[in-house]
Structures are given as C-alpha cells and as structure tokens.
C-alpha cells in the first residue's frame, strides 16, 4: 500500500507556513487568477514564490490550482501565467479544463499535472484518459463511494495516483446531475 499524502489547502502565505511547520506533506494554493476560489484571498506571484521556496526548504510540495473552466478570453492569460509559474517551480498544477491542460503541457511539461475534482472524475475510463494525456494524479469526484474508488484503483495503472477529499464542501447542485436523488435513491 502506498503512503498517504497529507495535502492541506492554504489561503495565504501565513497558512502555508503553518501547514508546513505542522506536518503537511504537500500544500495546495491558488493564485490571484485562474482558480475557483474567487472570494478567497489567494496568493500573489511573489507570495507564491516565497511559499514554494519555504515549503521546499522543509521538504514539502506545493501544488497550484488553475482549475477554472476556461472561456476563450482566458487562454492567452493562462499562457502568461504558466510562463511565470514555470520560473517559481511548483511541484504540480491542478487543472480541470482540457484546453488549460494542453497549454500547461506545452509551456511547462516538467511540472506535474493533476486533474481537479472539478473535472468530475467518476470512472476508471476518465482516469485512463487523463493518464494517456500525461497526468500523474486525478482527484476523485467528491460523490464517489469507497467501493467506487476501489474499482477505479483496480482498473488504472499502478503508477497513477488517486487523490480524494476526506472532508470538505460538497455542492448539492450541478448542471445535469441531481445529487439529492443520487444520494437518496441512487439515480441521478
């Protein structure tokens, strides 16, 4: 069995440092753009650079979210953003949009790419697809049971990593899915 990685979200440089000092194996952060935590404080590029350096000095990894579902107008800015991130060397990018994924693979292929839970990863076929695209890790959809996650594990390459939330927010509404009926009567 693989060791579990304790991955902690950090909303600021101060929180990142506390997570590192208190034993996180990895921390994920969002920048001022291209992440879904629009109301969070998030990190400036300077704070990201300082946080990544601090974490690396303590043997802790840092993953940066770029998990928006992009519109056409976002793509040029994403290119600039990844060019800047390449310089400060995060350990991975957490992405949900295939277009953004393609840009990350082109601009910073040396940085691992993880697929966000926002990509609704609910089956092993999806995991195999992302593995074939070069993703090292896929974050499960939060709605999956342990049995469903175990079935995914059995049907993907051993080298591929699965990440899952142990605790956190779960949206009750999602276009095309009725999570209430899924929970109550197992039909979406």
Which positions does each model-derived feature cover?
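Active-site-adjacent beta->alpha loops and helix N-cap segments on the catalytic face
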Residues: 39-49, 96-108, 143-157
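Glycine-rich, proline-tolerant flexible connector loops at the mouths of alpha/beta enzymes
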Residues: 28-47, 66-74
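N-terminal active-site wall of soluble small-molecule enzyme domains
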Residues: 60-129
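Conserved, mostly hydrophobic/aromatic
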Residues: 19, 97, 130, 164
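Conserved small/polar residues in nucleotide/adenosyl-binding loops
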Residues: 185-187
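Hydrophobic faces of well-ordered beta-strands that scaffold small-molecule active sites
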Residues: 6-9, 27-29, 62-66, 93-95, ...
